[in-house]
């Protein structure tokens, strides 16, 4: 059975075009911070009023902040961040990227940092390229960072492999450099095969997270 927060998020999304004020009210009333953050972002993405959109984005980031744990704050905030990318607001986008990257940097776990940055980078696929690469550099660092006791970060390397077709589409030379640094030959070969099989990849379809659908 679908939970009430999930149902209310879907209802708010559906109402955003036909009754944006009611959609905003419904999204605001969701008690769960995670679902409220997403619902407000979905309303912001679909509504036609610039004023209402700006309000919903601000409240969405606030709901994300209220989650407390660094990785949950950042992952949830990737939803309103993606709305900023898709609907304009370049100056605010830069401010929010700077804020979120600073928050991520406080997490000592490279695994959690990589998981958070994966969503941030997904939100920034349509952003100005310099912002994308700024987030990517932190993702790459987290994915390559050794785990406790110096263990190889296999999970991080596997995440980088997922991003290789997008990197290759944006900057083939940078993708090659990233491939060369992957320690595992099996993962590196998988990445090369994925790139070869998807020469004209659509970055947004390849990495759909966070989803605004």
Question: PLM features: residue spans?
Answer:
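Non-catalytic tandem-repeat scaffold regions and their flanking low-complexity/translocation tails
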Residues: 1-213
């Amino acid at each position: 059975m679908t939970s009430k927060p999930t149902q209310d998020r879907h209802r708010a999304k559906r109402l955003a075009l036909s009754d944006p004020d009611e959609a905003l009210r419904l999204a605001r009333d969701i008690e769960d911070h995670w679902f409220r953050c997403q619902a407000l972002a979905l309303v912001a993405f679909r509504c036609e009023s610039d004023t209402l959109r700006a309000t919903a984005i601000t409240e969405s980031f606030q709901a994300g902040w209220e989650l407390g744990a660094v990785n949950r704050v950042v992952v949830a905030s990737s939803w309103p961040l993606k709305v900023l990318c898709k609907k304009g607001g370049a100056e605010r986008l830069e401010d929010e990227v700077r804020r979120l990257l600073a928050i991520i940097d406080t997490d000592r776990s490279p695994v959690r940092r990589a998981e958070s940055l994966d969503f941030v980078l997904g939100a920034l696929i349509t952003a100005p390229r310099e912002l994308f690469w700024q987030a990517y550099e932190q993702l790459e660092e987290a994915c390559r960072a050794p785990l406790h006791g110096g263990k190889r970060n296999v999970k991080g390397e596997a995440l980088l492999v997922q991003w290789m077709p997008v990197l290759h589409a944006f900057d083939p030379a940078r993708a090659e450099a990233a491939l060369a640094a992957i320690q595992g030959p099996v993962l590196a070969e998988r990445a090369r095969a994925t790139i070869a099989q998807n020469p004209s990849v659509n970055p947004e379809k390849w990495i759909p997270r966070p989803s605004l659908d």
